[in-house]
Amino acid sequence: MKYWFKTLLPLLFPLMVGAQQNNTSPFKVIAFFIDKTEDAHLSFVHEANKWLPVFGRQNNFTYDSTTNWNNLNDTFLSHYQVVLFLDARPEVPAQRAAFKKYMDNGGGWMGFHFAGFALTPSDFNQDWDWYHNEFIGAGQYKSNTWRPTSAILRVEDTTHPSTKRLPGLFKSSPNEWYRWEKDLTKNPDIDILLSIDSTSFPLGTGPKPYEIWYNGYYPVAWTNKKYKMIYDNMGHNDIDFENGTNKELSFQLDNEIQNRFIIDALLWLGGRK
């Protein structure tokens, strides 16, 4: 028996070391964004590109970003375990097909705020049924609050790896909140992770009456159980448009609890949770 073990050990050792290295080597994240967007979205993009590399060094993942959406192809995506859409979606059919294939094959994705937006007619028509109706599941954008304001968020699924370290209720950074066409609570494939708690109402300051919400149920972050994905409606910083200074008044990632959700979401998507 001892001879058998000594003979087999040299053969097993490289496999053991390889498995250990695979468990400890960083997973790779690639973020796509557009450089022509409104200041509030671009502010979040700049913030993400500043801080997500820091979060990566602290949590064992690498972070790259690009404005070249032609990189949504099989060869490029094969180098990454997680894809982020910071402020947009792909518009070219070949890019969309490559992204769908990536997700169908088990890739990870997290989309923020405007990455889920579609409205017909607009510059971003709802012309991608799989993405908006099946994958994200929310359909078209319907309305939003204004100005960007903080909300009290409720953790709806306390067992999901992205939410386990969160308190049951927490205050978000100021954000422009979206209402959607479809009722996600009626979709059995959707697991709602975060929602706006009723103590947040009235939410928004107007000046238009419909920009202030007084009641209702509004999902903020969710996952589609058929895919390795999370959509997060947060991603719109407050900007001083009214006075014409365009000064940044708030930052999404200036919130330790909110950052904890993003980090744990990425770790789950990267296969580490």
How should these model regions be labeled?
Residues 47-51, 94, 98, 130, ...:
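Extracytoplasmic/secreted proteins, especially bacterial periplasmic and envelope-associated proteins
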Residues 73-74, 160, 251-255:
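Polar helix-capping/helix-linker motif
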Residues 144-231:
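Catalytic beta-strand/loop cores that center a nucleophilic Ser/Cys/Thr
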Residues 89-165:
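A glycine-rich, often tryptophan-bearing local segment used as a flexible ligand/cofactor-contacting loop or short
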Residues 36-37, 71, 90, 116-118, ...:
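Short, solvent-exposed loop/turn segments at secondary-structure junctions
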Residues 23-119:
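Helical hinge/lid and interdomain linker segments adjacent to catalytic or ligand-binding clefts
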